[in-house]
């Protein structure tokens, strides 16, 4: 492979393409003379659209095909939403860079209502996320939760056609696609704890590729890395994939990192919440300690039941 070419494996969805184009533009800005090529492809999670993600099972529904492309040397890097990225990597691949985070909150999207609290009894809310479902049901058990799959445009079209009274999406995706006007309300982390890594973009590459690692290094955002590492460490210890009722959100104030986490029954009947604080350089240890706290208070029972269903 030429020293001045780098090939990005990416999913074909508009949001995934935005992320890949963002990385391409940053690399070309930082390294004049570098040519960046995109290799768009479909993943299992993109193809199977008629089944709830939690029912398809397995981890890495949106990444495996991209990883195969790197292992076969058809691509040099893969760009991912951190919340879709499994905590374990195939041998020879690893997470190299975490870029600066966009807004990590969930967004309430509706054509007729301003917030979850405004929704009438029995209103239909669309989301395929067990994490969002458990928190919505805990706050509003009178609402009807209906599964919602597809890319951002598909989901908005289903809302507009009247299938749902409201839908919940990641705010970052709407902002990146310049669809901010569709956001009726940003849902605070207190109301809906985000998924681990939500709003952050990660770059994976071959662990032995020194050339690519050097090219990627300037894209690293250290504060985002600490936050996401803490969130992912909690998720790893809980053995969570991207389709589990687990929320994790880290914030940094000076050198101090505060991590909030939760595990909940998808029906909202039980939610276990915890918080831990410490030095940001201990991000992984903080995440693991919060996971242990949640497990000691019954999180394992909840997660075992989810995995068995």
Swiss-Prot record:
One of its GO terms (molecular function) is hydroxymethylbilane synthase activity. GO terms for biological process: protoporphyrinogen IX biosynthetic process. Pfam families: Porphobil_deam (PF01379), Porphobil_deamC (PF03900). Pathway: Porphyrin-containing compound metabolism; protoporphyrin-IX biosynthesis; coproporphyrinogen-III from 5-aminolevulinate: step 2/4. Disulfide bonds: none annotated. The keyword Transferase applies. Its EC number is 2.5.1.61. It comes from the Bacteria. Binds 1 dipyrromethane group covalently. SUPFAM superfamilies: Periplasmic binding protein-like II, Porphobilinogen deaminase (hydroxymethylbilane synthase), C-terminal domain. Keywords: Porphyrin biosynthesis, Transferase. It catalyses: 4 porphobilinogen + H2O = hydroxymethylbilane + 4 NH4(+). The modification S-(dipyrrolylmethanemethyl)cysteine is found at residue 242. Transmembrane segments: none annotated. CDD domains: PBP2_EcHMBS_like (cd13646). Its cofactor is dipyrromethane. GO terms for cellular component: cytoplasm. It is an enzyme of class 2 (transferase). Monomer. Tetrapolymerization of the monopyrrole PBG into the hydroxymethylbilane pre-uroporphyrinogen in several discrete steps. Belongs to the HMBS family. The porphobilinogen subunits are added to the dipyrromethane group. This is Porphobilinogen deaminase. It comes from Shewanella frigidimarina (strain NCIMB 400). The gene is hemC.
